[in-house]
A protein has these predicted regions:
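Periplasmic peptidoglycan-binding/anchoring modules of Gram-negative envelope and division proteins
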Residues: 9-42, 62-70, 107, 114-117
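Short, solvent-exposed beta-strand edge segments and adjacent coil->beta transition regions
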Residues: 5-7, 104
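Residue-level signal for pocket-adjacent positions within structured domains
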Residues: 5, 12, 91
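Periplasmic OmpA-like peptidoglycan-binding domain that tethers envelope proteins to the cell wall
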Residues: 44-117
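Pro/Ala/Gly-rich low-complexity, hydrophilic intrinsically disordered segments
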Residues: 1-2
Length: 117
């Protein structure tokens, strides 16, 4: 797999980017500007109603997208956004630490000549 991923964490019930998340995205900008495709996938833990989690997952992905586009609008044609509020957890949701890891957005990107899965 040749995709690369940047993980952006979020607080419980929030789609607001933290200063650390903004810094991480800004630090990766030179690489992202060279990417052929960028997919931003918003995710949640399993607490709360499904409809809320789907909406929150989308809001997280859009927050990342909006931050990237606010400084580099030329990324627009390379970006896509998905929400995955009810699946694909990277950690068990039965612990606080696991739920914290699942509250994230993934910025998955391919460089020139590669394709996203």
């Amino acid at each position: 797999d040749t995709s690369r991923t940047i993980i952006v964490q979020f607080d419980l019930g929030s789609a607001k980017l933290s200063p650390a998340a903004r810094s991480s995205l800004n630090g990766a900008m030179s690489t992202l500007l060279s990417a052929r495709q960028i997919m931003i996938v918003g995710r949640t833990d399993n607490t709360g109603p499904l409809a809320f989690n789907e909406s929150l997952a989308l809001a997280r992905a859009l927050a990342v997208r909006d931050h990237l586009l606010s400084t580099h609008p030329r990324l627009t044609p390379t970006l896509s956004v998905k929400a995955r509020g009810a699946c694909c957890f990277i950690a068990a949701n039965d612990t606080l630490a696991g739920r914290t890891q699942n509250r994230r957005a993934e910025v998955i990107f391919q460089m020139s000549g590669e394709n996203l899965p």
